[in-house]
């Protein structure tokens, strides 16, 4: 990918859209027909969309540098807050059709604990991702500049560790605290299953996006 402003803006756009959509669909739980601790694994609907954001910051960091990657994270946070406020504002406006309003509330209703969980997990995991990505990258390249071919190391290491932070924080806050599952011993296995299931999915997605990362960061 050429280091141009247009390409950088394109990646910012993909990052922002993926982030906002992930927050819209995060309340949906996907049932996976795999048993873990006697429970079906349940995945928040945001898992796939949100995984794209880590790929975008990694590409930005590799091509444009750490500063631009951090700028992307900060603008992403602002986008999340603005999107949430606009959804809440629109939700409060009087509706012509009551039934349509109920459908709207069901689809886009903002549970405050989900918002807190999402913002907390986002800021912590994305900041860690950028930090670790460049920490490992700089250390490996300092030994030998030709090690750029090994960029799968810092790409996967940063994403896979940051996804642990994101998964534990979001599920712990949104479902553990929000639904009160942390204080219900019967739901502990469900929480653990959600964490493990979601992380395994993110782990697989992180591994699968490696060829895309190489393609987008290759030097012609």
Where are these regions (language model features)?
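Membrane-helix interface motif
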Residues: 30-31, 89-97, 173-181
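Alpha-helical transmembrane segments of multi-pass membrane proteins
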Residues: 16-32
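Transmembrane alpha-helix/helix-exit interface in multi-pass inner-membrane proteins
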Residues: 80-97, 122-130, 163
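Alpha-helical transmembrane segments and their cytosolic interface
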Residues: 144-157, 164-171, 176, 186-220
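N-terminal membrane topogenic signal
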Residues: 1-14
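Central hydrophobic cores of alpha-helical transmembrane segments in multi-pass inner-membrane proteins
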Residues: 48-59
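Helix-boundary and loop/linker segments of multi-pass membrane transporters
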Residues: 4-5, 103-108, 144-149, 183-188
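Membrane-interface interhelical connector segments
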Residues: 89-113
């Amino acid at each position: 990918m050429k280091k141009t402003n247009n390409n950088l803006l394109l990646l910012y756009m993909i990052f922002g859209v993926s982030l906002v959509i992930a927050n819209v669909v995060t309340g949906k739980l996907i049932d996976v027909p795999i048993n873990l601790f006697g429970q079906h694994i349940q995945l928040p609907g945001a898992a796939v969309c949100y995984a794209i954001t880590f790929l975008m910051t990694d590409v930005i960091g590799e091509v444009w540098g750490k500063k631009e990657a951090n700028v992307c994270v900060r603008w992403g946070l602002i986008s999340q807050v603005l999107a949430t406020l606009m959804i809440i504002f629109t939700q409060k406006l009087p509706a012509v059709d009551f039934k349509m309003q109920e459908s709207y509330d069901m689809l886009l209703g903002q549970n405050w604990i989900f918002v807190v969980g999402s913002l907390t997990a986002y800021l912590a995991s994305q900041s860690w991702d950028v930090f670790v990505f460049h920490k490992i990258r700089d250390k490996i390249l300092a030994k030998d500049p030709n090690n750029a071919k090994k960029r799968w190391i810092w790409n996967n290491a940063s994403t896979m560790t940051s996804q642990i932070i994101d998964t534990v924080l979001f599920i712990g806050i949104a479902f553990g605290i929000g639904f009160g599952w942390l204080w219900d011993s019967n739901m502990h296995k469900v929480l653990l299953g959600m964490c493990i299931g979601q992380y395994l999915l993110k782990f697989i997605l992180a591994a699968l996006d490696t060829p895309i990362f190489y393609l987008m960061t290759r030097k012609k």
